[in-house]
Amino acid sequence: MMLAQEYKQELVSNTETYNISQKLDGARYNIHLSKGKVEIMGRHSKKPNNYKYPEIESEAIQLISDEDITLDGEMAISTTYGTWELTNFNALASREHTENKKQIQLLSRMLPAKFIVFDIITNDTIKLPLKERMEIMQNYFGQYPNLRRIQPIYNLNGDMDFANKLFQQAYGLGLEGIMIKKLDSLYEDRRSDAWLKWKCYKEADEKIIGYTSKERQISALILESGSKVNAIIDDYWKDIILKQDISTTKENTGEVQRYFSKPSLTAVIKYLERTDNNIMRFPILKEIREKEA
């Protein structure tokens, strides 16, 4: 799986041509199509997740051919706003953590996911530059409501003025950011500065060391930096958090703080910046995962 480097101005060359597209706030997935079979694989998945996204599987089946194909993209729940996708990560998280078959079928109708494809990998396209891979993608999508290709926004030749305007627009809409990709880049199974991610928010992984109770049973998560992030936790993670062994309990102005004896969970947090004492400003919980993942 090809991964992007963090954007830095010096990584953009005025001798290269780039494509700009939206950085989607979803979950990275690959869909493998081969020999009459579809496999929907998350970035950290050990087995296919077809059962979680029946609306995606039913459309992907129609793309099966004699050729082995991998579609690289982002699973998201979103509404289209002009050239942008307004994503709802919390809604996607509820889909990701639902295991009940009846609930999955219900959510696939009430909260249908979109698989937004930004690359196509075959034995032939692996040798082609991004520009040609993007042209090939145009032949695969268009008639499917939930399976579609990423909307290219702009091509630029090292001139960052328009890229800055797009970034500000993405920031104003509360989006994740933008992607800047070299049009002549080959698909590499590694992190590469041929793809750059320019995020509106910074992002960090921090251990969850406890939680607070005030208005809700879990009002906020306490992070290892001392930051607190308010969040409505879904039932899957709420159950795991409430089963953690507690070493210390404190109470302050009506807020109960409980600290874990052995923190085992990690929070992925979006935030604007940190204070001098390392506390995050305007933190937003993006996801929770097992510490070792």
What do the predicted segments below correspond to?
Residues M1-R43, N123, G142-K270, R274-I279, ...:
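Nucleic-acid 5′ end/cap handling module spanning
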Residues T15-Q143, L272-A293:
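Covalent nucleotidyltransferase
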